[in-house]
Structures are given as structure tokens and as C-alpha cells.
């Protein structure tokens, strides 16, 4: 298993680039040629870690073209961990491409007045690896623990 990259931002402001949406909320140049189960990994709608972070900023700041109520419901569904010190909102993703399992764990951690956005993407060439699914999350919590100076963030 290989950790590709972690993108984390220590800021609560929205300074990302512009994404363009049509009425449905999808990119105007939407291209589902990658297939319904892999368009986000390959094809015209593949998404980078930076785009994941930008989308998460817009979600957190209610800057998406959806009703505030709908966005708040999504944020509530995304709560992965809620403790007295912080809240993690996150989403997993998993797909296969070119013989590799590709796993995502994206979201953000809110702690007092600080916000940490993250996008973790890992790959494995071993099919049916029982450690793959939890590794997406475990790697991220290990890094967040270091960033927050805590031994056990999981």
C-alpha cells in the first residue's frame, strides 16, 4: 500500500479557486465517460485533491448552489467523529483502476477556531486486501494526531 499524498490546510477562510456549476450542481463540462462508478477517478470528471479541498471549503462555508437546509443535512451526515475538542466531517471513496484499488478519505476537522481540510488518497495493487478500507482513515487520523499534537486522534 502506498500513501500518495495528503493535502491539509490550516485555515478557516475560503481562498480557493472558482468552480463553475450549472443548475444541477455538476461541472458545466460534465463528462461521465469514465463510467458511473469511476468517473471521479478517470474520464472528464476526475477530481484532484486540491479540487476536493476547494469543494469542502465551499460546503463548509455554504457556498454551493444548494439550499442551506440541504447543505446542513449533508454536513450532519458527514460527521465521522464528534468529541469535546473537535468535529471531523468526512467522506470515503473507493474504486479500481488499472489493477489498483484507489481509496479516498476527504473532509475537514473543526477545532475551536481552526479548520483543517484534508484529502487522503491511497493505492494498493493487492486485490481483496482486508486492511485497505480502514487504512484510508487510519493514515489520516495518524497525521491529524501529529498536527494536533495528540497521541490518539482516532
Regions found by a protein language model. Give the residues of each.
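Structured C-terminal helix/loop/strand segments within mature extracytoplasmic catalytic/sensor domains
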Residues: 44, 53-154
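Mid-domain, small-residue-enriched loop/turn segments at the edges of structured enzyme/sensor domains
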Residues: 1-61
